[in-house]
């Protein structure tokens, strides 16, 4: 399993609700259709920072999710909300333990 972590900085508090809605309604469904998709999480870490974690079967699939997310930002015209490029980290998940998740 491979993870992609994207950290978005400089998000105005007044834009978080709109961004969250758009991610839920259009990005998450788009990512879930990618081959090898396992799960996706969007995290509000506070202070104008939001991070996402995507889990995929292979490194290539995880990398593709970053391309799809970048394309989505352009398609949704979110450059004004996401003014700074994300800091992207990808790698193999080497420890994983999960109990049942509660939907946010």
Residue ranges, per PLM feature:
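Short S/T/G/P-rich N-terminal loop/turn motif that feeds into the first structured element of a domain
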Residues: 1-51, 57-71, 78-104
